[in-house]
């Protein structure tokens, strides 16, 4: 199949043509987006073998990608471990195991002799009133995968390790409390982050739903990340911490089968480095209409 990609040719005397990046947005609105349309030919083939024994399931997966044009990333330091070439192999072994109210799952993946990725998780129903989840992930800085859909903070699964823990409690009828904590680390540089970094993400939400028509929830979220200092113009910028806090309260009320009223109030605080916090708020009212489908 043909895929969208950024085509690069050095000059009119240089016949070498290569791909600097893949385009996954699917848009062809501008000249540059249209120029990226279907320039790379990709051949993908692979397979899966699964084995189930009582409550245990194990699977072996393999896939290979071949490209008509080589992929060559830019010389930026964060691209040091990026995929280059015309062929990429991915193999993995996954498992899942269920015992009563406990479910364990995970996968170990690799590409070639270097890049490795590991994920292990647990889902536990403590009682009829509480559920817990725990997930650990490790993706090496040189792991590459084109179509992975992993539980990661980054948009692409690479150069990350982290631990996620969540809990959902239903203390009384019509009330639910959800909370999670996610702590992550990036051992190598990232785009706009010129140093190894770490961060965290916390959330607490309380929901009240007395019936099918009414739902009210209040949510507090706090996130800390590292980014380059935007005011520093050195080749390798120093990094600073960015902290974002958000508090949202929302009311959803179903007026009828086709009409829903929604009201939201949201407050935000953003702090970067040693500077003072920036504040903002949002108030909006929506009236959602879902038309009746005609036969």
Regions found by a protein language model. Give the residues of each.
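A subset of solvent-exposed loop/turn segments in beta-rich extracellular surface proteins, enriched
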Residues: 3-35, 84-88
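Exposed, low-structure sequence patches enriched in small/polar residues
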Residues: 35-75, 80-295
């Amino acid at each position: 199949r043909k895929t969208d990609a950024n085509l690069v040719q050095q000059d009119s005397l240089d016949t070498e043509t290569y791909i600097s990046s893949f385009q996954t947005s699917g848009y062809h609105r501008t000249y540059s987006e249209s120029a990226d349309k279907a320039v790379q030919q990709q051949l993908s083939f692979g397979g899966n073998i699964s084995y189930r024994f009582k409550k245990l399931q194990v699977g072996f997966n393999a896939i290979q990608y071949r490209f008509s044009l080589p992929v060559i990333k830019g010389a930026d330091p964060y691209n040091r471990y990026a995929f280059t070439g015309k062929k990429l192999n991915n193999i993995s072994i996954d498992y899942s195991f269920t015992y009563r109210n406990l479910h364990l799952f995970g996968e170990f993946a690799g590409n070639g002799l270097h890049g490795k990725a590991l994920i292990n998780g647990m889902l536990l129903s403590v009682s009829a009133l509480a559920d817990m989840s725990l997930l650990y992930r490790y993706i090496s800085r040189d792991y590459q995968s084109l179509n992975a859909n992993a539980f990661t903070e980054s948009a692409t699964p690479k150069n990350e390790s982290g631990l996620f823990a969540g809990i959902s409690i239903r203390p009384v009828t019509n009330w639910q409390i959800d909370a999670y904590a996610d702590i992550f680390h990036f051992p190598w540089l990232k785009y706009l982050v010129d140093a190894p970094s770490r961060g965290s993400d916390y959330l607490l939400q309380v929901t009240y739903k007395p019936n099918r028509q009414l739902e009210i929830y209040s949510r507090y979220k706090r996130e800390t990340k590292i980014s380059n200092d935007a005011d520093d113009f050195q080749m390798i910028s120093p990094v600073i911490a960015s902290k974002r806090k958000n508090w949202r309260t929302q009311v959803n009320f179903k007026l009828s089968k086709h009409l829903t009223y929604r009201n939201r109030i949201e407050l935000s605080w953003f702090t970067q480095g040693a500077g003072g916090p920036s504040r903002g708020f949002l108030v909006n009212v929506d009236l959602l209409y879902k038309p009746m489908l005609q036969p």
